From Swiss-Prot:
Its main location: cytoplasm. This is Probable transcriptional regulatory protein SynWH7803_1972. GO terms for biological process: regulation of DNA-templated transcription. InterPro entries: Integrase-like_N, TACO1_YebC-like_2nd/3rd_dom, TACO1_YebC_N, Transcrip_reg_TACO1-like, Transcrip_reg_TACO1-like_dom3, YebC-like. Keywords: Cytoplasm, DNA-binding, Transcription, Transcription regulation. One of its GO terms (molecular function) is DNA binding. It comes from Synechococcus sp. (strain WH7803). Belongs to the TACO1 family. Pfam families: TACO1_YebC_N (PF20772), Transcrip_reg (PF01709).
C-alpha cells in the first residue's frame, strides 16, 4: 500500500496547493447527476446518498447538489445524459493505469485520454488490459487507532469484511467485497464506529516500482495530466514510489 498511499497524498497535496475547488465541485456534481438517475430520494438510493456525502465533505454548496440531482432525475426538464466509462492503459515503465470517466461524448473523452497517454510516454489500451491487476472492492474509512484494534477485530467478525489497515492518523481502512459497501458501512455504524467515508476502489494486487527517477516523474506527469481532464472522475494505478525518490 505504500506507493498507492503516496500517490494519494501527492494528489491531496496538489489539490490543496492549487485550490481547484471548482473542478472538484464539477466532478462530484457529475457523480450526483449519474446517481440520481436511479431516483432523486437519497433515502432510497444508496449511490446517490454516497455521492451527496462526498459532496458535503468537500464543501460543495447545497444549491450545486440540488441542481445536480435535478439534472440526473429530469426534474424541471433538466435531464442530462452522462455515462460511466472505464478506460485502461499503461504508463511509462509498464505502470498500469485505470481511469473512470463520466462523459456525454465518449469519442471526445477517448481522444483526450489517448492524447494524454501518448504525450507522457504511455498508451491507452483495450478494455481488460490492466483491470485484472486490481481488485474492485468496498472501502470504509473509520476512526480507529492501535488501542482500539482488538475491538475492531471483534466487530469485523460479524461483518462481511476481508481485512483492515491501520493508519498513523487515528483512522483505519476496512475493506470487503465490491457488493457489500452499503451493508459494511451500515454495520460499522451500528457497532458505534465513526465512519468518515466509504467508496468503491480499485486496489492494486501488485505494484510497479520504476527503475529510475525520470520514469517516476514521467508517470506522475501522466497521472496529473489525466486528472486535469474534465471527464475524468477517478484514477487508479499500481505505481509505487521509491522512498528515495525526489520530485
Amino acid at each position: 500500500m505504500a506507493g498507492h498511499s503516496k500517490w494519494s497524498q501527492i494528489k491531496r497535496t496538489k489539490a490543496v496547493v492549487d485550490a481547484k475547488r471548482g473542478a472538484v465541485f464539477t466532478r462530484i456534481g457529475r457523480e450526483i447527476t449519474v446517481a440520481a438517475r436511479q431516483g432523486a430520494d437519497p433515502d432510497g438510493n444508496f449511490q446517490l446518498r454516497t455521492a451527496i456525502a462526498k459532496a458535503k465533505a468537500a464543501g460543495v454548496p447545497a444549491g450545486n447538489i440540488e441542481r445536480a440531482i435535478a439534472k440526473g432525475s429530469g426534474q424541471g426538464g433538466e435531464a442530462i445524459k452522462l455515462e460511466s466509462i472505464r478506460y485502461e492503459g499503461y504508463g511509462p515503465g509498464g505502470v498500469a493505469v485505470l481511469v473512470e470517466a463520466l462523459s456525454d461524448n465518449r469519442n471526445r473523452t477517448a481522444a483526450e485520454l489517448r492524447l494524454a497517454f501518448s504525450k507522457h510516454g504511455g498508451n491507452l489500451g483495450e478494455s481488460g488490459c490492466v483491470s485484472y491487476l486490481f481488485q474492485h472492492r468496498s472501502e470504509v474509512r473509520i476512526e480507529a487507532d492501535a488501542e482500539r484494534e482488538e475491538a475492531l477485530l471483534e466487530s469485523l467478525l460479524s461483518l462481511e469484511a476481508d481485512g483492515y489497515e491501520l493508519g498513523d492518523d487515528g483512522q483505519a481502512l476496512v475493506h470487503g467485497p465490491y457488493e457489500v459497501l452499503e451493508s459494511l458501512q451500515n454495520g460499522l455504524r451500528q457497532q458505534s464506529w465513526q465512519v468518515q467515508e466509504w467508496t468503491h476502489a480499485w486496489h492494486p494486487l501488485t505494484q510497479v516500482v520504476p527503475q529510475d527517477p525520470d520514469t517516476t516523474r514521467q508517470c506522475l506527469k501522466l497521472l496529473e495530466a489525466l486528472e486535469d481532464l474534465d471527464d475524468v472522475n477517478s484514477i487508479s494505478t499500481n505505481l509505487e514510489i521509491d522512498d528515495a525518490f525526489v520530485p
